[in-house]
Structures are given as structure tokens and as C-alpha cells.
């Protein structure tokens, strides 16, 4: 039986490449902010959604918080209420730092 996967961030870099690589092997339910789907019959939740880059130089704290914190809490809460057994969350480099001053290591204290 094909595993069913609920995925957020399917239009981002990681999500797009993940789907292209695994689309023949799994069944996907794609979460979009417009449809606001809920986890129902999926076995696995992959939470790839997040805002990491401000390419337009229009930094908006509220938007970063909504996407990176509120959405994560909502998705995880829905996961806990679902039959899914696995939750995988990929975070961004923004959770550690927001500049290129030094190389990233495990010893760096997060400073988002």
C-alpha cells in the first residue's frame, strides 16, 4: 500500500524538489494557505513551509511569525489529532542566523 504524505511548502525549493523526486512512490496531499487542508488519512506529515529569505527587502516581522511559528503550531496540533505516525519538520537557516558573517556549526547559538 502506498504511503500517504501530507506536505506543506510544496511550492518552495525543498518541497518542489522532494515532490519531483518522490511523486511516483507516494500519494501526496498538498497544503496551501488558500485551501487550508487538514490532515485526515495521511501516514506522514512533512512540514517544509517557512519564510527564510526577504528577497524583496520588505522585512515583515508579523509575516515571518505567522508562517514560521503560527503555521508550525497549527500543523503540529493537527498532526497530534490525526492518525499520522511521523512528523518531519525542516527549519531554515533563519532559525540560527540572518547573515553570512561566519560558517554555521552546531555550536552556534540560535539568534533568529
Per-range role (PLM):
Residues 73-112:
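Conserved Rossmann-fold NAD(P)-dependent oxidoreductase catalytic core, especially the SDR/UDP-sugar
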Residues 48-52, 91-94:
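Conserved NAD(P)H cofactor-binding loop of Rossmann-fold oxidoreductase domains
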Residues 55-71, 104-112:
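Short alpha-helical oligomerization interface
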Residues 23-40, 53:
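Adenosine-cofactor binding site in Rossmann-like domains, unifying the SAM/SAH pocket
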Residues 15, 55-56, 97-100:
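Glycine/Thr-rich phosphate-binding loops of Rossmann-like dinucleotide-binding domains
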Residues 2-24:
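N-terminal Rossmann NAD(P)H-binding glycine-rich loop of SDR-like oxidoreductase domains
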Residues 2, 42, 84:
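Phosphate-coordination loops involved in phosphoryl transfer and adenosine-cofactor binding
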Residues 8, 43-48, 89:
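Rossmann-fold scaffold of SDR-type NAD(P)-dependent oxidoreductases
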